Amino acid sequence: MAAAAKTTTKSAKPRRTRRTARRDPLAISLLKKDHREVAAMFDEYEQLEGDAEKLALFNKIALALNVHTQIEEEILYPEERGEVDDDLLDEAYVEHDGAKKLIAEIEAMKPSDQYYDAKVKVLGEYIAHHGKEEEQPGGIFSQAKKGDEDLNEMGERLKARKEQLMAELSAKKPS
């Protein structure tokens, strides 16, 4: 019986798994969290029927994407130049430009306009593809983790800049 109790006690101890042992640094976890939140918003958009609801949610999506791309372009991408393959960073900038153009097109439309929903759907697919490329093995995040940058310290700066931009850009949006 003592052996059984010992086994029970031993198995009750929390085990450290590879996943918990390799937690992402703050910069990467913050950006991945943004990817998940925006993906959830696009999923929610698909369920909406009313124009007012669609417009309100799209405005949230656009704000989140504008802030996310800006913090990546101001902090992550320039500081990872030399740590991450130039081609990956160049492609990321081009993908951001394409997303910004599509966001501007959608912002100039009304939800009742032809192709509005289609453009939002394509933007969601475009963003999902971009996020997948950043997160995949060999992608920007993977290469950044192998570099010399302090990604936890960078994460603090990304977080602070994100908060600042959210406040600034939210204040500019008409309610």
Give residue spans per PLM region:
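Small-residue-biased structural context
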Residues: A2-S175
